[in-house]
């Protein structure tokens, strides 16, 4: 029994990035002003951390606007209290992807902390409707959610708030294995 508890604790610490390098979002020119689109900077930070063998990208207090960001194996996202990942209200920021944070075939990653992922769903849906009316996008265009994971393994989603998705569901997990969701709160006011 002690052996199982020890192995579980070791897996939890390694997946959550507690034994890995921690990289502050501000070091990657990621702006916390709630205005600038940080999609390229956040993706660049995740790609860099993955190329270094993994670690944690840490967001401190602020509002970080982004479109779709691809998660990578070995890279965790930490949302400190007061950190809000704010989904872009421009459908083109998602490039046809299904979520603000999305991953397919990702292993050993986590999103954790007491921050918020805010999809600004009503405003995004207004933009999608306008783009459909102008025939700029098809009527069956992908409407992004907040977190989308497909065929992912050894994933922990812990303690953050999911707010205002543009879809009925804020979190999609399709297949995969050893995915833990613990202490997350859905605020769909």
Stretch-by-stretch model annotation:
Residues 1-22:
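Bacterial Sec-dependent N-terminal signal peptides
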Residues 18-189:
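Extracellular/periplasmic carbohydrate-active domains that bind, remodel
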